């Protein structure tokens, strides 16, 4: 992970992505000097600098990096990708409407609203958003992180560079823009990032650069103005001592049943808070996160009104119990060696998957994207089962490749939407000029069970966990484990090993293996979660086991 370098006052940030705030995971700087002979440097996560000696070269390199000029559509058993109709769309927000047949997306480069008919496989003619400054800038875009539909079926989306939120009326095919009535003196925008609605249809949103909850009164909103917008300052006293420019608002989610708004706040990799706002009492309640959860971003509400949050500085996601304030941490599988082009069975030490945004489907299943894990995951709170879908695209321009001759990198699947009819998941590939679909109704090739589901150990004590894998179809199985013991899913000083790491199963067969876990002698007493399961290459299935250390 890298921090932005301040190159000069004439250097403009054209990409702020990955982590929320000034500390980011992917940064690109492009010099916009008038002198063509002046060098231009583009630095990005994770490694190399691209040097251009002319504006023409700068544009070419920018397009190669961010426009998916040479990308191809890929597929596996669960994922199908679709190339967008225009050049260099740089899609972020995507929205699966109603039953998931009509898929909306925003071109952050071209400033256009597009739609894809998943039944016919055809793209509709894109609709230009009236005001979009980056459309005329060859190396710029305006990030649109969120798009949702209101109760009337109209689309709302956030807009970074115009410092606004937009509404698209489908009946009249007209756009309206509502300007945020303030901006950041350091960044020139509040950077609207997340939007939601209450039961009355009023709109609520937050901006990365604004510690405030913004409210839009539908009856008072006026196109092209700030009328009807008001704000409620979010208390940030808990971030005292941290430079204000490093304090960011992550996202918000409404618990409509209880009239509560949940908001994530962070100083990336320094401090995290989850904030509860009661719409009736107009009171804030703040929950300080432990040090290992210092980058909370995405929030979704489960069927029991508990917020689930993704931490975009680790490989962890977690539940905050709304009644007790207790936190239960879970880990994704550890980062795949495939991301690094490694022939070994494990990724380099310290690799993170960076869970980003999280959403719930009509069955109460939680979905989230693993930014640098190159997966879309779903977690069933009822069965404590995590299923991860591998995205078949890898771009080595976005990877720390050990061997560039081997496929490596990630697809930059930065946002997604869950179709409420069929629960298929649609996601955008921001640097690849594509959208993709996960067929969530297709059966997994394996099922995993583990016993016991919860256990209590003393430090230094070992236990034998039985893990059973049953095959629905012929498959090769690789056993996996991870945990909430560390930020990246490793076991830390604890150890764990399977009696057999790899085997083949025929359809209908099952196999039980032992997993011997030994808690380290210096492990801090408390509750942890161990994830055990299997990988089949396109799909991973893990079961969560609670471990109480006494």
Q: Can you name each region flagged by the protein language model?
A:
Residues 50-63, 80-111:
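Beta-strand-rich domains and repeat architectures in extracellular enzymes and scaffolds
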Residues 117-121, 169-173, 217-224, 277-282, ...:
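Short loop/turn segments that connect beta-strands within beta-propeller blades
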Residues 404-445:
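Blade-level signature of beta-propeller repeat domains, shared across WD40, Kelch, NHL, RCC1
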Residues 62-64, 80-83, 124-131, 176-182, ...:
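Beta-propeller fold detector
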Residues 112-115, 164-167, 211-217, 272-275, ...:
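A short loop-to-beta-strand structural motif that recurs across blades of beta-propeller domains
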Residues 103-110, 140, 157-161, 203-210, ...:
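Conserved beta-strand positions in repeat-built beta-propeller and related beta-rich domains
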Residues 442-550:
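Long beta-sheet-rich domains in secretory-pathway and surface-associated proteins
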Residues 87-99, 132-151, 183-199, 237-257, ...:
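Beta-rich, blade/repeat-based domains predominating
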């Amino acid at each position: 992970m890298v921090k932005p370098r301040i190159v000069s006052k004439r250097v403009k940030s054209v990409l702020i992505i990955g982590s929320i705030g000034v500390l980011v995971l992917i940064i690109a700087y492009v010099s916009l000097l008038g002198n063509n002979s002046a060098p231009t440097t583009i630095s990005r996560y994770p490694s190399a600098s691209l040097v251009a000696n002319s504006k023409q070269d700068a544009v070419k390199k920018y397009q190669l990096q961010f426009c998916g000029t040479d990308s191809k559509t890929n597929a596996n058993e669960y994922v199908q990708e679709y190339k967008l109709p225009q050049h260099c769309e740089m899609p972020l927000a995507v929205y699966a409407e109603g039953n998931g047949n009509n898929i909306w997306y925003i071109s952050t480069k071209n400033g256009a609203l597009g739609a894809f008919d998943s039944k016919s496989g055809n793209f509709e003619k894109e609709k230009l958003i009236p005001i979009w400054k980056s459309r005329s800038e060859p190396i710029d875009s305006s990030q649109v992180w969120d798009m949702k539909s209101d109760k009337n079926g109209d689309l709302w989306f956030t807009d970074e560079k115009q410092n606004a939120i937009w509404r698209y009326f489908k009946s009249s095919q007209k756009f309206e823009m509502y300007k945020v009535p303030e901006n950041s003196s350091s960044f020139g925008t509040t950077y609207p990032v997340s939007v939601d609605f209450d039961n009355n249809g009023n709109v609520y949103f937050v901006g990365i650069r604004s510690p405030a909850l913004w409210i839009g009164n539908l009856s008072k909103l006026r196109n092209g103005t700030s009328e009807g917008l008001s704000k409620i300052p979010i208390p940030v006293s808990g971030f005292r001592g941290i430079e204000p420019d490093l304090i960011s608002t992550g996202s918000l989610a409404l618990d409509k049943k209880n009239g509560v708004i949940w908001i994530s706040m962070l100083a990336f990799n320094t401090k995290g808070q989850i904030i509860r706002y009661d719409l009736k009492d107009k009171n804030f309640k703040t929950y300080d996160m432990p040090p290992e959860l210092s980058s909370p971003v995405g929030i979704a509400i489960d069927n029991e009104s508990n917020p689930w949050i993704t931490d975009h500085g680790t490989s962890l996601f977690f539940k905050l119990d709304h009644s007790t304030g207790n936190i239960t941490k879970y880990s994704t599988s550890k980062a795949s060696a495939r991301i690094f082009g490694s022939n070994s069975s494990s990724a380099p030490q310290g690799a993170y998957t960076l869970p980003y945004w999280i959403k719930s489907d009509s069955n109460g299943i939680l979905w989230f994207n693993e930014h640098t894990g190159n997966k879309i995951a779903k977690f069933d709170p009822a069965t404590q089962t995590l299923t991860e879908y591998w995205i078949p695209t890898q771009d080595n321009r976005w990877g720390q490749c050990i061997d560039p001759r081997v496929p490596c990198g990630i697809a930059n699947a930065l946002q997604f939407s869950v179709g409420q009819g069929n629960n298929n998941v649609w996601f955008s590939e921001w640097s690849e000029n594509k959208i993709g679909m996960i067929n969530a109704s297709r059966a997994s090739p394996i099922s995993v069970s583990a016993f016991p589901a919860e256990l209590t150990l003393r430090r230094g004590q070992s236990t034998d966990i039985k893990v059973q894998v049953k095959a629905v179809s012929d498959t090769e199985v690789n056993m996996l484990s991870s945990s909430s013991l560390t930020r990246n899913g490793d076991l830390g000083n604890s150890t764990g090993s399977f009696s057999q790491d790899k085997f083949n199963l025929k359809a209908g067969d099952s196999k039980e293996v032992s997993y011997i876990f030994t808690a380290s002698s210096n492990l801090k007493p408390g509750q942890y979660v161990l994830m055990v399961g299997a990988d089949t290459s396109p799909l991973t299935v893990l079961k969560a086991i609670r471990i109480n250390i006494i």
